[in-house]
Amino acid sequence: LSGPRNQRITLEAEPGIWLKGSESELRSAFSNLVFNAVKYTQDEGSIRIRWWADAQGAHLSVQDSGPGIDAKHLPRLTERFYRVDSSRASHTGGTGLGLAIVKHVLMRHRGRLEISSVPGHGSTFTCHFAAAQQITGTV
């Protein structure tokens, strides 16, 4: 996934957590978050992916050690075509639609996206799904 960039990717997943919904849409949203982390994390950086459940529901978080994002940009990150800065956009490519698609998919699945970031310390994107969206038992 990260190729010659030598990024360390860690996956922590609780077994037996399933969601009701469109597999292709959820896969698209989750992979978008992971690919963004790979794209914006420097060589030798780290990415942590977590999948867990608690009393509130199921959660997926993607945390990276990338450049981070200034707080003034966070409210607009899920707008279509919004870019933090054009110089970063020309370096990394993309359309500016990825996080808008993630937000749309989560809304269709009664979920929400939480974004936290500190410039120079990376970002964390967390998808939260209500307990009602979970499937219990074996699928």
Residue ranges, per PLM feature:
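Glycine-rich GHKL/ HATPase_c ATP-binding element in histidine kinases
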Residues: 121-123
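Conserved glycine-rich
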Residues: 110-111
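Short beta-strand/loop element within the Bergerat-fold HATPase_c
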Residues: 44-56
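Short helix-loop "hinge" at the ATP-lid/N-box region of the Bergerat-fold HATPase_c
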Residues: 37-38
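Short conserved segment of the HATPase_c
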Residues: 69-81
